[in-house]
Amino acid sequence: MTVASVEQMFSGKIQVGSEVTVRGWVRTRRDSKAGLSFVSVSDGSCFAAIQVVTPAHLPNYETEVRKLTTGCAVIVIGTLAPSLGQGQQFEIQAQSIEVVGWVEDPETYPIQPKQHSLEFLREVAHLRPRTNLFGAVARIRHCLSQAVHRFFHENGYYWITTPIITTSDAEGAGQMFRVSTLDLVNLPRTETGGIDFSHDFFGKETFLTVSGQLNVEAYALALSKVYTFGPTFRAENSHTPRHLAEFWMIEPEIAFADLAEDARVAEQFLKFLFKTVLEERDDDLAFITERVEKTTISKLEGFINSPFERIEYTDAIKLLERSGKKFDFPVEWGLDLQTEHERWLTEKHIGRPVVVTNYPEHIKAFYMRLNDDGKTVAAMDVLAPGIGEIIGGSQREERLEMLDIRMAQFGLDPAHYQWYRDFRRYGSVPHAGFGLGFERLVVYVCGLSNIRDAIPYPRAPGSAEF
């Protein structure tokens, strides 16, 4: 007897006629006048559930089988057989059903066999993976995670785990969560009245990281090609469907690379991810296309087959100014592009993914390399139809004197970044990298409208349940 997953049965890995054991949860139960019950069982291994044909002669048929409701946990032993009904290829002809866990009160069980609003499901995030949508999102998220590591491994990158607790603000924006063990009721004070962090756990002021980039740069300047993939945190009091306080970031870093090489890798990377998810999660994407976003599959296929357009920020501004469209946000050289501008460029004007390069220096981070014009930095944003910016990257400033100037412009204390400055003192080379918010990627692939549905337990202002 083989313990088999539903995925193994539907993919042909289990031979028809085999005696199998399947373990999972009841989706639905339907009783027949012919003295049978049809129990749909899902184990989460794929989108489909398998139908279990349960005869009335089973010893627990009346006492247990006919009382099964959505969410009950069962172990089924039976024979895998061709299905006589419509809608699926195989079924299990049950020899026994063991009820492992009952749903205490089926009437109040939150995940009923009906469509629930996404707002409601966020309130029961611990149970929402049992729904069709969030089961699909979880499997797609897993597939994309594995594809990230596979792409970099196959292309000679090393995975570096960067710290979550840090003393540095990698973006220079100041929107950071403080980490402290100090007694908030009785804070130690300095002579000037400030908080004396020398009494804190680390002996200095520390935060949750907003990016692993600064740390991973150190390893790029020794191992040539590296990446980090881990949680990051932003204390940005934003309640939009595009922002989370805790999310995962993918950040490769490449030594001896310029902005053009950075953009080339970003294009290869995204196309690899989308190709992989189309190949490996076709069942989940079929459901997404049917129920969430009709164009999901064609959108991803179009992305893979389209060469990315390259355009400079200055030229993008000119196109937007000449578009004749009235935007909600102003279009002016020196202002950052908003989502509506990005989507007009990639959807209405160019019709495919776009890489916008060379942004004004004052709207980008301090570590980006100043161009020869003295006004722009070697930065890029990859814009995708349907979402706008999906990747942000740059060539890093490898010249110590220029880095110091940029840090002064941002009001950053060089003493806090002495270790980062050391990279420019000891064998500095041109290098580049980019960042991709993993949840934004999941949103794009799954056609979701709210990023809080792209992560198992969303953290946002006023929301840290579970």
Swiss-Prot record:
Pfam families associated with the record: tRNA-synt_2 (PF00152), tRNA_anti-codon (PF01336)
Compartments (UniProt record): Cytoplasm
Top-level division of the source organism's lineage: Bacteria
The EC number(s) this enzyme carries: 6.1.1.22
Gene Ontology cellular-component terms listed: cytoplasm
SUPFAM superfamilies noted in UniProt: Class II aaRS and biotin synthetases, Nucleic acid-binding proteins
Key words of the record: Aminoacyl-tRNA synthetase, ATP-binding, Cytoplasm, Ligase, Nucleotide-binding, Protein biosynthesis
GO molecular function: asparagine-tRNA ligase activity; ATP binding; nucleic acid binding
InterPro entries recorded: Aa-tRNA-synt_II (IPR004364), aa-tRNA-synth_II (IPR006195), aa-tRNA-synth_II/BPL/LPL (IPR045864), Asn-tRNA-ligase (IPR004522), Asp/Asn-tRNA-synth_IIb (IPR002312), NA-bd_OB-fold (IPR012340), NA-bd_OB_tRNA (IPR004365)
Catalysed reaction equations from the record: tRNA(Asn) + L-asparagine + ATP = L-asparaginyl-tRNA(Asn) + AMP + diphosphate + H(+)
Gene3D superfamilies: Bira Bifunctional Protein, Domain 2, Nucleic acid-binding proteins
GO biological process, one term: asparaginyl-tRNA aminoacylation
Family affiliation: Belongs to the class-II aminoacyl-tRNA synthetase family.
Quaternary structure and partners: Homodimer.
NCBIfam families noted in UniProt: asnS, PRK03932.1
Name of this protein: Asparagine--tRNA ligase
Organism: Xylella fastidiosa (strain Temecula1 / ATCC 700964)
Gene designation per UniProt: asnS
